[in-house]
């Protein structure tokens, strides 16, 4: 049994423009080297472009894109009797949100490397793709689901 105590959750202050904790977390994911103002400029720019393209509010586009990418199941490695099994487990909501934010950022960064577009444009495109249940982040989620479905037989090895 571990002697260390459980780490306290940090309280994240909502972002200044939309007053949303989720958006503040997304800005933290996008942020590199502590450059918060640059990360805010990128995220707010991408959201305003998405808002102009679709015609819905920026927060509704962001929240529905996030909900479409959030995973419900994932696989975890569990070693039993010298054999490692990929055991499907349900994802807690906090981890699910964190994964979705990371996947959207990662998909936009991958698109940025492939094209000569600015990161803001790639992030806008990725948010719109996730909103429409397509794109790189949604594809990552579907791959995770396929892995969980393929290893459904090992679900009785759940973690305690």
From Swiss-Prot:
Taxonomic source organism: Ehrlichia ruminantium (strain Welgevonden)
Keyword Ribonucleoprotein carried by entry: yes
InterPro entries in the record: Ribosomal_uS7, Ribosomal_uS7_bac/org-type, Ribosomal_uS7_dom, Ribosomal_uS7_dom_sf
Listed GO MF terms: rRNA binding; structural constituent of ribosome; tRNA binding
Full protein name: Small ribosomal subunit protein uS7
Known role: One of the primary rRNA binding proteins, it binds directly to 16S rRNA where it nucleates assembly of the head domain of the 30S subunit. Is located at the subunit interface close to the decoding center, probably blocks exit of the E-site tRNA.
Assembly with partners or alone: Part of the 30S ribosomal subunit. Contacts proteins S9 and S11.
Gene Ontology BP annotations: translation
């Amino acid at each position: 049994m571990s002697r260390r105590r459980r780490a306290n959750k940090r309280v994240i202050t909502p972002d200044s423009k939309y007053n949303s904790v989720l958006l503040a977390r997304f800005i933290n994911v996008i942020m590199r080297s502590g450059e918060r103002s640059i990360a805010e400029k990128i995220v707010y720019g991408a959201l305003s472009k998405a808002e102009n393209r679709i015609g819905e509010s920026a927060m509704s586009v962001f929240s529905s894109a996030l909900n479409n990418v959030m995973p419900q199941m994932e696989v975890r490695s569990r070693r039993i009797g010298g054999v490692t099994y990929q055991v499907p487990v349900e994802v807690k909501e906090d981890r699910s949100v964190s994964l979705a934010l990371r996947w959207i950022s990662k998909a936009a960064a991958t698109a940025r490397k492939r094209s000569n577009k600015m990161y803001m444009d790639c992030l806008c495109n990725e948010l719109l793709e996730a909103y429409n249940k397509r794109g790189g982040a949604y594809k990552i989620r579907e791959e995770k689901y396929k892995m969980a479905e393929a290893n459904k037989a090992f679900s009785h090895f759940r973690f305690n």
